[in-house]
């Protein structure tokens, strides 16, 4: 008897309830599995392949329906699956559940994943538990299908007092937990899953992208409209700008190249070498150059900058710095916290007792007075000899050597990002720093001084420093198609290794041979190099940086200590002020930027520092000072100082290798764009997730949201196979739909609500207020006292123009002011009628793009909101009523603008029956309210004379009832009102 009842309760094929759908899907799966077990798959491989494909499809269907049942029964008791955030995007597919079930059955049967034998052995017990639990759930669900199924029910109707229902509930909970554990284990074994650190780094990358976008919007590189419209160009612009911002602006963020490589995000880890080179060059750009580069990365426009090559500070120098370098330096020094404690520029005006101070004073005076004396130094034969000492100097002539000026950093973003690589040099005219009086120094004392300061430790440190430089800078760049990014950062005529290493290496072998020529080879850069090195040592304040850890140590510290004895407090307070002004972090090399003039950093080599130092040393003080230096030498501290100075020289030297600023910016553009565009290929899924989050966070909030009820969960996988009759029924009135499509352009429709309209229509109109456009309405022969609704059912249709007027405000203001000239309007009636006719002819031909006349048309460029749209429409109608000549002989006619259509993307369901739209269930717009309905809810048709639609068009059922039932009564009332208005 029970079997007979079960047979009677078996779900029908057309039953759309969840239990019925599960019943038929499970039966199909069982049939395929039985057929697959009935023959030898090795004998018939083609048939086996087809059946396996059908098996996996049926498994997907069964698990999808089971998932819907668990959603309804378990609800919040389901096992969390937050781990899916660590999965690659391509793994999260619709058939993931079927793949997991198939893999669990294979593992339970004894097979193993290829090249994953260890993981397969560990997962096998879990896979067996999953298959067993799923089999139990299938049996219980089949039993419920035969006992408690309600045909075509959208919800489950289970007997809560039945023990099998409670058993089903517990079985579903166990299966859900086991299946979630197996999903994490199986996917982790098959693909690379992000660790916790990698996932957090990806989130930080998203924060960087968002901050970059907000910064680009703030400085005008991008527009908010592009973000709101999801402009595809932003998919390329944002990653490019993020690289620049992450390396320069937010230097301590996720693109901090100083952190270990394993802590860097996996997205940028392959590009670490090239990013370091890009960072070093970016830090030498000023504000103007950085803005030009970012604009180039956004728009791909030509570089439009004429900044000379010498401008290499992160902040653009002010005109005062360029025109008056000495004056600006003195002002910067005097405006500090202690006016009497400054660098050697201000020291020359207060201290002149010692020989060192006299030498510095002569150098500064010579720089101030000899801006145009470059011809002498360019013809000096000793300059050529000094230039040949380093290959890095071959590309520059003394006439092109700019002097450095202090470039204070007003913006905290660049001051944080700036390091010693941003050794400043501005566009000041070159100065001749040579002084004939200094050539009287004794060369023999210099040679003896050099030989006494050499040591074996210095040789070892020099070799190690050279190895570190070669290892850091000679690494190959990350490849893009047909391009080496590492080589792109080098000039075409200079090899990669010559950029940073050649000057030090070649100088090592040539300095001893030219030791006696140190005082004779003075040029602008060498004298400036002495001051730069001396000030650098003063600012760093190393306790024992007396000895230079190079192969040819110099007496820079001797000069420094000689200057420090009378002004030790001055230097200390100056160094403190420098750190407070620029907010530098713990790196020592950060404390000597943007404060004092440096020579051309390309020429500030070891030999240059040696020669310049010896110029300022009094011969009588060399021997005691040198003994004091040797007594307090610290090799490690001096080595750290040498690394910092070398880093600054290397970075600025790399910039000076390029022919022009345009060439440098172009190289940076190619490299940055190459790295950013490769992210689109190598990390497409991660980049899509980041950009999606960035767009959602930074898009402007919608002005008005359409209230559409949420869809029910049980109908997410609703299967609907439309028959021929269904298709015909749902597309009923196809001719009307074609007519509607020809008659109305939804993009140009306006939200319009007449004063006498009902509230329901106004609500539908307000739902599409965001689609409002500037429409103009022509009203002819309108009575002065007639209401806007009094002409809605007139027989004649006035012309409706949809135009984007450029003078909407002027037309609206003139229409408002026309009330004061009513009598003049009456006298000029004939002239106005002629203007109306001409305006209509132009609108019929090409459309009106000019401001409409106040007497004929009125624009609707009000605020984009439903309230202002409706109130503005009333004002426009009233203004037009006042401007028209009252006449009892003419009939009233007014045509309203059709309502805006709700976009298809904002209406996933029918607004009447809430049925989701599918490939067969089409969307239809009601011409009266603009709503989106299915074919069943919008199969009515009626003419809409108030919109100028005399033919029957598609309307929804609610609008059809209102229009048909109230049409005659409203028309009669309107006629009475029109007669009364004309009589008055």
UniProtKB/Swiss-Prot annotation:
Pfam families registered for this protein in UniProt: FYVE
Comp. bias regions, Low complexity: 326-356, 369-380, 387-404, 412-433, 630-642, 811-869, 886-899
Give, as residue ranges, the zinc fingers classified FYVE-type.
904-964
Q: Which GO terms describe its cellular component?
A: early endosome membrane
- Which SMART domains has this protein been placed in? FYVE
| Biased composition regions of type Basic residues, renumbered to the chain | 571-611
Q: What is this protein called?
A: Lateral signaling target protein 2 homolog
């Amino acid at each position: 008897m029970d079997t007979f009842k079960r047979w009677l309760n078996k779900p029908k094929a057309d039953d759309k309830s969840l239990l019925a759908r599960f019943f038929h899907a499970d039966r199909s799966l069982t049939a395929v599995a039985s057929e697959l077990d009935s023959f030898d798959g090795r004998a018939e491989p083609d048939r086996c392949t087809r059946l396996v494909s059908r098996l996996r499809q049926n498994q997907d269907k069964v698990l999808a329906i089971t998932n819907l049942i668990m959603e309804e029964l378990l609800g919040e008791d389901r096992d969390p699956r937050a781990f899916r955030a660590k999965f690659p995007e391509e793994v999260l597919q619709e058939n993931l559940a079927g793949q997991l079930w198939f893999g669990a059955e294979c593992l339970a049967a004894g097979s193993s994943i290829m090249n994953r034998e260890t993981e397969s052995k560990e997962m096998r017990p879990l896979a067996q538990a999953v298959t067993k639990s799923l089999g139990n759930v299938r049996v219980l669900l089949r039993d419920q299908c035969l006992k408690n199924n309600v045909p075509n029910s959208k919800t489950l109707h289970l007997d809560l007092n039945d023990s099998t229902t409670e058993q089903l509930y517990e079985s579903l909970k166990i299966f859900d937990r086991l299946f979630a554990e197996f999903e994490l284990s199986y996917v982790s074994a098959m693909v690379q899953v992000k660790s916790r650190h990698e996932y957090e780094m990806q989130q930080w990358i998203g924060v960087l992208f968002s901050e970059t976008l907000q910064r680009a919007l703030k400085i005008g590189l991008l527009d908010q409209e592009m973000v709101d419209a999801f402009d595809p160009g932003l998919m390329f612009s944002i990653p490019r700008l993020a690289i620049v911002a992450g390396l320069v602006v937010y230097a301590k963020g996720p693109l901090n190249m100083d952190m270990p490589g394993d802590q860097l995000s996996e997205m940028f880890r392959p590009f670490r070498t090239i990013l370091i080179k890009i960072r070093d060059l970016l830090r030498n750009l000023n504000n103007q150059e950085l803005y030009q580069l970012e604009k180039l990365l956004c728009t791909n426009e030509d570089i439009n900058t004429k900044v000379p090559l010498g401008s290499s500070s992160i902040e653009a120098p002010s005109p005062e710095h360029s025109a008056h370098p000495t004056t600006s330096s003195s002002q910067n020094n005097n405006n500090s916290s202690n006016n009497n404690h400054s660098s050697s520029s201000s020291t020359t005006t207060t201290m002149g007792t010692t020989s060192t101070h006299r030498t510095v004073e002569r150098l500064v005076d010579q720089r101030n007075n000899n801006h145009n004396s470059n011809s002498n130094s360019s013809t000096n034969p000793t300059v050529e000899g000094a230039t040949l000492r380093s290959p890095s100097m071959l590309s520059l002539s003394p006439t092109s050597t700019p002097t450095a000026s202090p470039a204070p950093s007003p913006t905290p973003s660049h001051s944080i990002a700036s390091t010693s690589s941003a050794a400043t040099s501005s566009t000041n005219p070159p100065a001749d720093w040579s002084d004939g009086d200094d050539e009287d120094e004794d060369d023999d004392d210099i040679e003896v001084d050099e030989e006494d300061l050499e040591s074996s430790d210095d040789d070892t440190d020099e070799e190690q420093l050279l190895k570190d430089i070669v290892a850091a800078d000679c690494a190959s760049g990350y490849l893009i198609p047909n391009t080496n990014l590492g080589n792109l950062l080098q000039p075409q005529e200079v090899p990669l290794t010559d950029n940073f290493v050649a000057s030090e290496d070649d100088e090592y072998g040539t300095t001893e041979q030219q030791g006696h020529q140190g005082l004779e080879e003075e040029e602008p850069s060498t004298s400036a190099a002495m001051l730069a090195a001396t000030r650098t040592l003063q600012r760093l304040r190393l306790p024992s940086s007396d000895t230079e850890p190079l192969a040819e140590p110099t007496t820079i510290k001797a000069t420094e200590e000689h200057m420090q004895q009378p002004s030790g407090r001055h230097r200390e307070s100056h160094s403190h002020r420098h750190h407070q002004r620029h907010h530098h972090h713990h790196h020592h090399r950060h404390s000597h930027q943007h404060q004092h003039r440096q020579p051309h950093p390309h020429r500030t080599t070891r030999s240059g520092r040696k020669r310049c130092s010896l110029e300022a040393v009094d011969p009588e003080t060399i021997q005691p000072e040198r003994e004091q230096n040797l007594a307090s030498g610290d090799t490690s501290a001096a080595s750290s100082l040498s690394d910092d100075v070398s880093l600054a020289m290397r970075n600025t030297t790399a910039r000076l290798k390029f022919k022009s600023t345009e060439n440098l910016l172009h190289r940076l553009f190619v490299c940055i764009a190459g790295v950013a565009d490769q992210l689109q290929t190598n990390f497409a899924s991660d980049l899509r997730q980041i950009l999606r989050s960035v767009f959602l966070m930074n898009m402007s909030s919608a002005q008005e949201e359409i209230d559409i009820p949420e869809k029910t969960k049980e109908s997410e996988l609703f299967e609907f196979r439309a028959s021929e009759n269904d298709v015909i029924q749902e597309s009923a009135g196809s001719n009307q739909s074609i007519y509607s499509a020809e008659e109305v352009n939804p993009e140009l429709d306006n939200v319009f609500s007449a004063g006498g309209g009902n509230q329901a229509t106004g609500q539908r109109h307000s739902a599409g207020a965001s689609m409002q456009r500037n429409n103009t309405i022509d009203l002819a022969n309108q009575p002065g006292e007639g209401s806007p609704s009094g002409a809605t059912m007139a027989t004649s249709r006035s012309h409706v123009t949809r135009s984007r007027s450029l003078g909407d405000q002027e037309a609206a203001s003139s229409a408002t002011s026309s009330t004061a000239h009513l009598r003049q309007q009456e006298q000029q009636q004939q002239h106005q009628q002629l203007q109306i006719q001409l305006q209509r002819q132009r609108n019929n031909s090409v459309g009106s793009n000019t401001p409409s006349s106040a007497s004929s048309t009125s624009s609707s460029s009000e605020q984009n909101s439903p309230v202002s749209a409706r109130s503005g429409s009333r004002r426009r109608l009233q203004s037009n009523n006042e401007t028209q000549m009252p006449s009892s002989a003419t009939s009233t006619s007014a045509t309203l603008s059709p309502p805006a259509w709700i976009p298809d993307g904002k209406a996933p369901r029918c607004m009447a029956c809430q049925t989701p739209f599918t490939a067969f269930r089409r969307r239809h717009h009601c011409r009266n309210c603009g709503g989106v309905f299915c074919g069943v809810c919008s199969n009515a048709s009626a003419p809409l004379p108030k919109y100028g639609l005399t033919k029957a068009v598609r309307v929804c059922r609610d609008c059809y009832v209102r229009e048909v039932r109230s049409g005659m009564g409203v028309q009669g009332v309107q006629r009475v009102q029109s007669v009364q208005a004309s009589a008055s």
